[in-house]
Amino acid sequence: MTERSVIHDTFVIERTYPASASRVFAAFASREAKDAWGETGDMAEAEPATGPVAFDFRVGGHERFGNVYQGVRFTYDAVYYDIVPDQRLVYSYEMYADGVRLSVSVATIEFVSTDDGSVLTWTEQGAYLDGFDGPDAPQLRQGGTSEMLDGLAKYLA
């Protein structure tokens, strides 16, 4: 029998961008934009996986995609719960590796205009399940999110 466990963690990442809150928000609101900046680091080298892909950016809508990295099929499955244009996104998502659920998270992304652009604050609460990503799972997720936001900075430049 598989040993069951949960690691709970919350992290907050704040980034300042020289782009309006509206422009930063728009980078999350279209599949084409997210595809341009969302895959970074090692995962940028991953192959797209076959299977259902969705990008339904509305409250109750789903975002779903997958890729294959080092022979493992990763799947991301999200549901949007709150969308306030140019101000806030709240969604939950599950991550899978070869069909095994690795984690369930709630992400809140806030966009605030400033004189020089905007500030994005990403708050994520995660439940990392059954030790599949090891004891460093929260740090790995935060690092991956930080890399992704670096990709957003390059996209907005």
Segments the model singles out, each with a brief description of its role:
Residues 21-22, 81-88, 110-119, 154:
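A short, structured loop/turn motif at beta-sheet edges
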